[in-house]
């Protein structure tokens, strides 16, 4: 498979934007998608973060189907995978040339992915996978589920490390340019991340940066920060490409 791990494919989701999101052309994102896209329209499957947010999942598919059409990345349809059709995942996934791992609450999505049996199902998948925010986080073998909802940072029972899909060993923290100075439960998000990096390392990405995984190699496109051992370092600049493995 070809795996794109994005913070967001269409700019910062927390800032005002057009009704139909425009796919980000920074760091060759759209160009790299087009380079691997088949020369015909493919079925798209958007695997939800919240399996019961039916209206939200339908609307997300509607707007992103148009986004991909506007970027000349043709889909026959973009259908949501949530609680309504979860039992069909075994047949839906092999039919889909494109899979979107949607954004949302990381632990909620992680639980849904496990219910679907996705880690095993992806072993034989050879299409294009696009992770978006939480979806990119849950693609990792061991996920860094950074606290994001009020109460999570202060909860000693909140699990910050989860078993993910195993599509990559790279853990990401998305929307970093937006969240780094936020305060959660009295702690700055950046300070929470630095403390957590003493246990396991991860990459913080701003919107517009992404990791491309293909043919056994991975590369960071755009700016990123490496967190490890309680420290962080900016390791790449916009429009630069850094091989990771």
Regions found by a protein language model. Give the residues of each.
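Portal/gating segments that form or line small-molecule/metal binding sites
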Residues: 45-108
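C-terminal and late-domain segments of enzyme folds
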Residues: 1-38, 48, 54-58, 145, ...
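Structural motif
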Residues: 4-5, 98-102, 130-131, 171-173
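Glycine/threonine-rich flexible loop motifs
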Residues: 106-115, 182
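Catalytic-core regions built around general acid/base machinery
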Residues: 92-95, 115-127
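Catalytic nucleophile loop
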Residues: 101-102, 124-142
């Amino acid at each position: 498979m070809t795996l794109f791990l994005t913070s967001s494919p269409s700019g910062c989701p927390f800032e005002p934007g057009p009704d139909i999101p425009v796919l980000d052309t920074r760091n060759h994102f759209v160009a790299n998608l087009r380079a691997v896209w088949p020369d015909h329209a493919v079925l798209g499957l958007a695997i939800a973060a919240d399996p019961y947010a039916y209206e939200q999942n339908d609307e997300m598919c509607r707007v992103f189907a148009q986004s991909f059409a506007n970027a000349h990345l043709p889909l026959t349809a973009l259908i949501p995978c949530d609680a309504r059709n979860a039992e069909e995942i075994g047949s839906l996934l092999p039919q889909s040339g494109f899979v979107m791992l949607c954004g949302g609450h990381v632990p909620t999505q992680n639980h849904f992915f496990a219910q679907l049996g996705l880690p095993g199902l992806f072993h034989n998948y050879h299409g294009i996978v696009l992770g978006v925010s939480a979806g990119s986080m849950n693609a990792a073998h061991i996920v860094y589920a950074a606290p994001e909802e009020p109460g999570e940072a202060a909860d000693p029972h909140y699990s910050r490390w989860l078993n993910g899909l195993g599509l990559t060993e790279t853990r990401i923290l998305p929307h970093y340019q937006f969240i780094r100075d936020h305060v959660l439960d009295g702690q700055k998000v950046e300070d929470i991340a630095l403390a957590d990096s003493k246990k396991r390392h991860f990459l913080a990405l701003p919107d517009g940066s992404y990791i491309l995984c293909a043919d056994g190699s991975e590369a960071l496109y755009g700016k990123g920060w490496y967190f490890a051992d309680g420290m962080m370092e900016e390791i790449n600049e916009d429009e630069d490409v850094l091989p990771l493995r």
